[in-house]
Structure formats: C-alpha cells, structure tokens
Amino acid sequence: MALLDRTARSFLLTEIVSGMALTLKYFFKPKATINYPYEKNPISPRFKGEHALRRYANGEERCIACKLCEAVCPALAITIEAEPRADGSRRTTRYDIDMTKCIYCGLCEEACPVDAIVEGPNLEFATETREELMYNKDRLLANGDRWEPEIARRLELDAPYR
C-alpha cells in the first residue's frame, strides 16, 4: 500500500502543487517589508543612534567635564581633556568619541549628571572613511544643535523611566 501511495504522490506531484498553493497564498497578502529609503519604520523614543553634545538655552555647552562618561564606557571609546576656566568651573577642551569602538550601550548617557551627552535619533550616518567616524567636540556639538528639538522631546517622553 505504501508503494501505491508513493507512486500516486509522485505521479500527481502533490508536493509541488501544495508548495505552489502556499506561494499563491502569500503572493496576494500584504507585504511585510517596507521600501526603505522612501518609507521608514517608527523609531522608539529610547532608540540609541548618533551621539550628540547638548547646549543650554543660552548657548553654553552642558558638559561639566566630570569624565563619568569616559569612566563608564566599556569600549573605551570616549576621550576627554578639560581645563578650569576663569570663573572656577571646568569645561572640556577635547571631547572625542571613536564611533568605530562604540557599542551604543547608552551608559555614557545614563552616567551624565547634566544630560550633556545623548544618543540622538539619527541612524543614517554612514561614512566613506574610518577617519570620519572619529567624532570631535565640534561635530558632537553640531549634532546636538541639529537634533536638539527631537532630543529634548525624546528625553521628556523617557523622563518617567529614568
């Protein structure tokens, strides 16, 4: 009897027919993918993207050179140098992040007492050379200036969980 069943299945091509039926079933369903450059998925308020240094409303940079972010970084991607100012406060003279080392864990953002370093909403920061992935203070401040409204909104949404 098994020989007869096997012969009937191979003669009637039931496996091929069932495979084609499955293909036709999914062919007419809505697609699960998106057309990426033109369509984008919504991004979570907790998304960790490109780093940015923030400023206060008066234009002064927030970073107080406490170096907590440098100390907590597991990848050792952050380098900070600071000098005291005339008014007695400290400010950074050098703030570098090696984005090739960064693992986007967000520990630097959590450690910062003044919310100076944040991981912004930008996920499209591909470069052509490795040198472009070495972010200095000016580039980080420019990122902060560019994304400040979005960063402030996301920090406000995330405030109950911090």
Swiss-Prot record:
- Cellular localisation: Cell inner membrane
Q: Which UniProt keywords apply?
A: 4Fe-4S, Cell inner membrane, Cell membrane, Iron, Iron-sulfur, Membrane, Metal-binding, NAD, Quinone, Repeat, Translocase, Ubiquinone
InterPro entries referenced in this protein's UniProt entry, alphabetically = 4Fe4S_Fe-S-bd (IPR017896), 4Fe4S_Fe_S_CS (IPR017900), NADH_quinone_OxRdtase_chainI (IPR010226)
Q: Superkingdom, according to UniProt?
A: Bacteria
Q: Which reaction does it catalyse?
A: a quinone + NADH + 5 H(+)(in) = a quinol + NAD(+) + 4 H(+)(out)
The residues that the entry says bind [4Fe-4S] cluster 1 are: C63, C66, C69, C112
One annotated GO biological process:
aerobic respiration
Membrane topology reported for the UniProt record: Peripheral membrane protein
What family does the database annotate? Belongs to the complex I 23 kDa subunit family.
Q: Which PANTHER family match?
A: NADH DEHYDROGENASE [UBIQUINONE] IRON-SULFUR PROTEIN 8, MITOCHONDRIAL (PTHR10849:SF20), NADH DEHYDROGENASE UBIQUINONE IRON-SULFUR PROTEIN 8, MITOCHONDRIAL (PTHR10849)
Briefly state the protein's biological role.
Answer: NDH-1 shuttles electrons from NADH, via FMN and iron-sulfur (Fe-S) centers, to quinones in the respiratory chain. The immediate electron acceptor for the enzyme in this species is believed to be ubiquinone. Couples the redox reaction to proton translocation (for every two electrons transferred, four hydrogen ions are translocated across the cytoplasmic membrane), and thus conserves the redox energy in a proton gradient.
Instruction: Name it.
Output: NADH-quinone oxidoreductase subunit I
**Which species is this UniProt entry from?**
Granulibacter bethesdensis (strain ATCC BAA-1260 / CGDNIH1)
